[in-house]
Amino acid sequence: MSISAIITAYERIEQTLATLRVIQNCMPPPDETLVHVDANQLACENAIRNDFPSVRILRSEDHVGPGGGRNKLVAAAQFELVASFDDDSYPIDSDYFARALRIFEKFPEASLVCAALYHAGESIGLDERSAHWAADFSGGACIFRRQAFLDAGRYVPLPVAYGMEEVDLAIRLHSQGGKILTTRWLRVFHNTDLKRHGDPRVTAGSIANLALLAYLRYPVSLWGIGVGQCANRLLWLLRHGRRRGILRGVTMIPPHVWENRRYRAPVSKKVVRSYLALRRAPVVVEL
């Protein structure tokens, strides 16, 4: 079994190059590495070509966001298993890809395997051989089954995707009987302290995206759950002092929903409740 590695890049050239170095130094390395360069960032593309001539590069002239970039990368990947990273996330363990292959061999029913993700300033946990079936995943620290990703309909491409892209795809995978396995035996380091999450644009997007998620995937009878999720997000932002961007987020809900209405494909009430139940109570398995 072979594995592709994909990275979404934008403006952060040095971080992208650092991530590529770690990935290429893994033992064994992935069988191919692809990078998507967003928004016509030619300087980033040229730097990658100069330092890593064997890496396949895809570039979008428009700003398609990380989800839009991953859509293109997964579609272009040669192999069925696709390990996904951000421009500032990379494996902690040098045998990451070998471990990933062993996990997929043991759990052929897994549509996606998600690693334990650690951020700058956090204590890094041991690589315990533990795992559980989960509802959600992190797009910068996971391995997709390529066909399952494509069959689920890929990501909704959003420039600011916080609170939307991964949950949306997870719900659609769940509706198709797909399963997400999370394990601490795979570890990924996200080289950020998450300060950018305080950006007003991120705050606004996280509010509008929750409303969009409810509109796109929930049946009308469950839209009340979406309202509650938006309210909880607002309360969390207020408690954490992230007031800048809240008003913008609320007012952008109607146009945001309208612009993305073509993606509406609600799942059943049973699927939504099953997904939320799994989120509350993951199922432990033996690795």
Regions picked out by a protein language model, each given a short descriptive name:
Residues S60-A77:
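Glycine-rich, basic loop-to-helix element that forms the pyrophosphate-binding segment
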Residues R21-P30:
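Short, acidic, metal-binding catalytic loop of nucleotide-sugar glycosyltransferases
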Residues V82:
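Short aromatic/hydrophobic "clamp" motif used to bind/position activated sugar donors
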Residues Y90-D127:
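Conserved donor NDP-sugar-binding/catalytic core segment of glycosyltransferases
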Residues P30-N40, L58-S60:
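Short beta-strand/loop segment that forms part of the nucleotide-sugar
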Residues C142-F144, A148-G153, P159-R187:
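A short, conserved alpha-helix in the catalytic core of glycosyltransferases
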Residues V37-E45, S89-Y90:
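A conserved acidic beta->alpha catalytic loop
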Residues G205, L222-L287:
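Non-catalytic, C-terminal membrane-associated alpha-helical segments of glycosyltransferases
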